[in-house]
Amino acid sequence: MQGSVTEFLKPRLVDIEQVSSTHAKVTLEPLERGFGHTLGNALRRILLSSMPGCAVTEVEIDGVLHEYSTKEGVQEDILEILLNLKGLAVRVQGKDEVILTLNKSGIGPVTAADITHDGDVEIVKPQHVICHLTDENASINMRIKVQRGRGYVPASARIHSEEDERPIGRLLVDACYSPVERIAYNVEAARVEQRTDLDKLVIEMETNGTIDPEEAIRRAATILAEQLEAFVDLRDVRQPEVKEEKPEFDPILLRPVDDLELTVRSANCLKAEAIHYIGDLVQRTEVELLKTPNLGKKSLTEIKDVLASRGLSLGMRLENWPPASIADE
């Protein structure tokens, strides 16, 4: 086996052993030493917590007001029925939420096969038992809400948000959306030519039948790869801060000198010198203004006092004056 000492091995053999329709073993080798546990643990956590699926979230049973009651002619109490409904394996196509109905009467078991649904819904395990009717005159009618989601969402997390609008008799169910029921991984020794310090990763998993084990592994690997993409190129992906553009000049400098409410004599003297804006005025010095015809010390004092009341003074330096909005006039 030739190659750089810093070059990582890539898995070349992927073996999938389909034990049953819901049980499979996936073998991946060879892996660099330590990568068996690194990849195995990451895939295991994703498969258990992040796989999307469908689950029962709400149930309404005729004649039942709360989950701590019983129903005449039914062997199980309501809590046990809800627990059995949590194990319902449903595959839904093209929808995020569906309502299923179940109506059954007479002695015998009530199974998932008794559920009425449309063509977008598939009951994967129709033999799954929901409850048992023990009386010839007994019956049970229920409406079952199935939603698409990810991970595990307890009913308590939805109680407060839905309490005001949830009618009496609508029972909330802990939703376990993950189609993966069990997963374990094992790391064994592997050998390639003269190297004996390599890993072989063996993943064994079982699903509820709504997803093929091979497809589940593929989805988990895709999720992991997408999450790691951000580390491939470590450029700052944060959105640039939008800085509020500050005006180039104080707005008061753009106002006409008439807004200073000077005496007519002072105002006319300034206009004669082409001083039309306050920004024009503050750039003049006392000496320059005293050279203005008909503008004496009294008018100068008036101008200085008015500017001072607005936080301005004579002799100020303004870069890039006048602004384009004034220069174009």
From Swiss-Prot:
Report the EC number(s), separated by commas if there are several. Answer: 2.7.7.6
A single Gene Ontology MF term assigned here is: protein dimerization activity
Q: What is known of its domains?
A: The N-terminal domain is essential for RNAP assembly and basal transcription, whereas the C-terminal domain is involved in interaction with transcriptional regulators and with upstream promoter elements.
The GO biological-process annotations, alphabetized, read as: DNA-templated transcription
Give the gene name: rpoA
Gene Ontology, cellular component aspect? cytoplasm; DNA-directed RNA polymerase complex
Primary role:
DNA-dependent RNA polymerase catalyzes the transcription of DNA into RNA using the four ribonucleoside triphosphates as substrates.
Under the heading Gene3D superfamilies, the entry gives: 5' to 3' exonuclease, C-terminal subdomain (1.10.150.20), DNA-directed RNA polymerase, insert domain (2.170.120.12), RNA polymerase, RBP11-like subunit (3.30.1360.10)
Q: Coiled coil: which residue ranges?
A: none
* Protein name as catalogued: DNA-directed RNA polymerase subunit alpha
Catalytic reaction list: RNA(n) + a ribonucleoside 5'-triphosphate = RNA(n+1) + diphosphate
Q: Which domain of life is it from?
A: Bacteria
Q: Which family does it belong to?
A: Belongs to the RNA polymerase alpha chain family.
Q: Return any one Pfam family short name.
A: RNA_pol_A_bac
Provide the alphabetized UniProt keywords.
Answer: DNA-directed RNA polymerase, Nucleotidyltransferase, Transcription, Transferase
Region annotated Alpha N-terminal domain (alpha-NTD), chain positions: 1-235
Residue numbers spanned by region Alpha C-terminal domain (alpha-CTD): 249-329
Question: What is the protein's species of origin?
Answer: Yersinia pseudotuberculosis serotype I (strain IP32953)
Q: What is its quaternary makeup?
A: Homodimer. The RNAP catalytic core consists of 2 alpha, 1 beta, 1 beta' and 1 omega subunit. When a sigma factor is associated with the core the holoenzyme is formed, which can initiate transcription.
Under the heading InterPro entries, the entry gives: DNA-dir_RNA_pol_insert, DNA-dir_RNA_pol_RpoA/D/Rpb3, DNA-dir_RpoA, RBP11-like, RNAP_asu_C, RNApol_insert_sf
